[in-house]
């Protein structure tokens, strides 16, 4: 894996695209160099503010991937991102157009589900995205009002629009679990990276370095695929929630129309 430097990080951030592969590849590189986490976060924030509006959301996705996938190796990134992440969310939200503003909220929802940060940080993030429109606690009566207000005239976020569902389904057509090429690459990994008994074959420094490189390449491949699978699981959970909300509201809408039709029949 390439050596770390501030210039190398700046270059990689400038080349970052919004593809899942690009985000996860850079995330793995950053996690590998996590001893530089403070500098990485500083450069990330600086480059985020310099990035064009259509690239800012990708920086947030990168931070999400790094924070979540580095936790099992150490708290460095979670701790170093904490002082800047609220302002970063505000910045991305303010610079995004209306169609993209829901995406930071999706990242926040995942962090809430997984308790990525303490409640006080999550509350600050909620305030950064929603202001006073989304309070932390609601009464039972308020929740029931929200549930009963679902109709075709409701906000576009409740329920999801048909095009949002179609888009989510289309994105899953290229999901990691269906990537035959990666399946084949994993199946074709050399036996040397799977069987520890073959370590006895190492007879000199050169053969040891060759094996080390094979293991590193295999780890990169598997870590990348694991990250893609984790993202796919999140996408499928989100789609399940969207479908559930959509079906519930459609049933309520149908029941409302049937009731109105019955009233008309009685009147006539």
Curated annotation (Swiss-Prot):
Q: How does it assemble?
A: May form a heterodimer with RPRD1B. Associates with the RNA polymerase II subunit POLR2A (via CTD phosphorylated at 'Ser-2' and 'Ser-7' of the heptad repeats).
Of which family is this protein a member? Answer: Belongs to the UPF0400 (RTT103) family.
According to UniProt, the name of this protein is: Regulation of nuclear pre-mRNA domain-containing protein 1A
Which intervals hold domain CID? 1-133
Pfam assignment, any one:
CREPT
Query: This protein's superkingdom?
Result: Eukaryota
UniProt-recorded Gene Ontology molecular function terms: RNA polymerase II C-terminal domain binding; RNA polymerase II complex binding
User: What is the annotated role of this protein in its UniProt record?
Assistant: Interacts with phosphorylated C-terminal heptapeptide repeat domain (CTD) of the largest RNA polymerase II subunit POLR2A, and participates in dephosphorylation of the CTD by RPAP2. May act as a negative regulator of cyclin-D1 (CCND1) and cyclin-E (CCNE1) in the cell cycle.
Gene name of the record: RPRD1A
GO terms (BP aspect): mRNA 3'-end processing; RNA polymerase II promoter clearance
Q: Which GO terms describe its cellular component?
A: nucleus; transcription preinitiation complex
Give the subcellular location: Nucleus
> What are the coiled-coil residue ranges?
none
Keywords assigned? Nucleus
The protein's predominant localisation is nucleus
């Amino acid at each position: 894996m390439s050596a770390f430097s501030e210039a190398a990080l700046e270059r990689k951030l400038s080349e970052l695209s919004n593809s899942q592969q690009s985000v996860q590849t850079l995330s793995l590189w950053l996690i590998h160099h996590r001893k530089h986490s403070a500098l990485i976060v500083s450069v990330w924030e600086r480059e985020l503010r310099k990035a064009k509006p259509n690239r800012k959301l990708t920086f947030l996705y990168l931070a999400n991937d790094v924070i979540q996938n580095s936790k099992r190796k150490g708290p460095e990134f979670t701790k170093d991102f904490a002082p800047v992440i609220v302002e970063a969310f505000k910045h991305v939200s303010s610079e995004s157009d209306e169609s993209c503003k829901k995406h930071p909220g999706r990242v926040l929802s995942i962090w809430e589900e997984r308790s990525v940060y303490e409640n006080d940080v999550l509350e600050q993030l909620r305030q950064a995205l929603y202001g006073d429109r989304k309070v932390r606690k609601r009464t039972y009566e308020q929740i029931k009002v929200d549930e009963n207000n679902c109709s075709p005239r409701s906000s576009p976020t409740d329920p999801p629009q048909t095009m949002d569902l179609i888009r989510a389904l289309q994105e899953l057509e290229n999901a990691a679990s269906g990537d035959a090429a990666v399946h084949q690459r994993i199946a074709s990994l050399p036996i040397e990276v799977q069987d520890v008994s073959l370590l006895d074959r190492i007879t000199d420094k050169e053969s040891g370095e060759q094996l080390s490189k094979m293991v590193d390449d295999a780890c990169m491949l598997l870590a990348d695929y694991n990250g893609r699978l984790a993202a796919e699981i999140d996408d499928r959970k989100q789609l399940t929630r969207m479908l559930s909300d959509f079906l519930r509201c459609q049933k309520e809408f149908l029941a409302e129309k049937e009731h109105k039709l019955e009233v008309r029949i009685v009147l006539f």
